[in-house]
Amino acid sequence: VRAGHPLLGEVEQLVLLAVLRLGDGAYAVPVRELILREAGVDLSRGTVYVTLERLEGKGYVTSWFSEPLAVRGGKARRYFRLRPSGVDAVRAAKRAVDRLAAGTVLAPAARKA
């Protein structure tokens, strides 16, 4: 593990990438839907919520609450945004995978056979 870049789990990577793609206004339901649609991974809502909270604890995302919403029975919605450290963590994870894949059948140059 490199200093400053602890390894991300697969679910953490997916959730961070989904929040990044959704931009400001990302919340758990669209995060879950994007991961299912784009990655084919069906995470429970609970898994998404717990992962978002863990990522916030690690300093990779920040969250805030909306005003109470009538469509939610007067409850607020919790939104998430990537912090620069979250972007750095995703980049570091991608670099690590790319380095490990280099020289294997997964590498672009190796596919030309």
Residue ranges and their predicted role:
Residues 48-55:
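Basic amphipathic alpha-helical segments that dock to polyanions
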Residues 1-3, 92-93:
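N-terminal hydrophobic signal/anchor transmembrane helix of membrane proteins
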Residues 58-73:
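Beta-hairpin "wing" of winged helix-turn-helix
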Residues 76:
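Exposed loop/turn and edge beta-strand positions of beta-sandwich/beta-sheet ligand-binding modules
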Residues 5-47:
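N-terminal helix-turn-helix DNA-binding core of bacterial DNA-binding proteins
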Residues 2-6, 67-69:
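Short beta-strand/turn micro-motifs at beta-sheet edges
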Residues 85-113:
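Amphipathic alpha-helical dimerization/coiled-coil segments
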